[in-house]
UniProtKB/Swiss-Prot annotation:
Transmembrane segments: none annotated. This is Fibroblast growth factor 5. GO terms for molecular function: fibroblast growth factor receptor binding; growth factor activity. The gene is FGF5. Glycans are attached at N112. GO terms for cellular component: cytoplasm; extracellular space. Residues 1-20 form the signal peptide. Plays an important role in the regulation of cell proliferation and cell differentiation. Required for normal regulation of the hair growth cycle. Functions as an inhibitor of hair elongation by promoting progression from anagen, the growth phase of the hair follicle, into catagen the apoptosis-induced regression phase. Keywords: Glycoprotein, Growth factor, Mitogen, Secreted, Signal. Residues 69-83 have a biased composition (Polar residues).
């Protein structure tokens, strides 16, 4: 009885080990067994859902970030400078017509000339592109513009009407012509000009020519005062060579000569 019982135990042990070994071979690699999968099915589903939510949240964050970057880019384009800050020159434009006038821009949009320079005649000329400049009144904070009818006025915003072509003449004066407005059939340019009374001329007038002094302006810009360069030169003093020291000779007492001669004065009267 004991031997048969032991044989049964041994056979059952072999059968159980073979069955367990077969299950291990049947299960594919990288997948948990039935015990592992059956332990917490809810946990697996929750992990999958959490992964899905994290991926969706990351995609939403990336999309919102890209949208914010796009909004920032458009905002930067909208908030960019309306005129180029390069090549700024601050001063006045002097026209030598009549008694001489300084071009000035008023806050209410009026443009004319004044014989005496004042705060309204302080202008800022800045470069827009090659050969194209803009003129802004420092006090009025408005831009010089020319309408499609050739009238000079001041504009609060910098537009294409505010662009002028700057040319240097042979007499060291400058002319300023509208960059977009001109006489279409002949292609004649419209220039900024003042008359003898200091009033602004229409650029479309046939009398406004680049050869006339009414279109010639002399830029008067403030030049920075150069600091005075001063320096001191120290010349080394030449030291006099020391005089040779004379040897001290002991002074001897004067000796009285033994043969002394005395003379007596004799006075003779009469």
């Amino acid at each position: 009885m004991s031997l048969s019982f032991l044989l049964l135990l041994f056979l059952s042990h072999l059968i159980l080990s073979a069955w367990a070994h077969g299950e291990k071979h049947l299960a594919p690699k990288g997948q948990p067994g039935p015990a592992a999968t059956g332990r917490n099915p809810a946990g697996a589903s929750s992990s999958r859902s959490s992964r899905g939510t994290t991926s969706s949240s990351s995609s939403s964050v990336s999309s919102s970030h890209s949208a914010s970057l796009g909004n920032q880019g458009s905002g930067l384009e909208q908030s960019s400078f309306q005129w180029s800050p390069s090549g700024r020159r601050t001063g006045s434009l002097y026209c030598r017509v009549g008694i001489g006038f300084h071009l000035q821009i008023y806050p209410d949009g009026k443009v004319n000339g004044s014989h005496e320079a004042n705060m309204l005649s302080i202008l800022e000329i800045f470069a827009v592109s090659q050969g194209i400049v803009g003129i802004r009144g420092v006090f009025s904070n408005k831009f010089l513009a020319m309408s499609k009818k050739g009238k000079l006025h001041a504009s609060a915003k910098f537009t294409d009407d505010c662009k002028f072509r700057e040319r240097f003449q042979e007499n060291s004066y400058n002319t300023y012509a509208s960059a977009i407005h001109r006489t279409e059939p002949a292609g004649r340019e419209w220039y900024v000009a003042l008359n003898k009374r200091g009033k602004a001329k229409r650029g479309c007038s046939p009398r406004v020519k680049p050869q006339h002094i009414s279109t010639h302006f002399l830029p008067r810009f403030k030049q920075l005062e150069q600091p005075e360069l001063s320096f001191t030169v120290t010349v080394p003093e030449k030291k006099k060579p020391p005089s040779p020291v004379k040897p001290k000779v002991p002074l001897s007492a004067p000796r009285k000569s033994p043969n002394t001669v005395k003379y007596r004065l004799k006075f003779r009267f009469g």
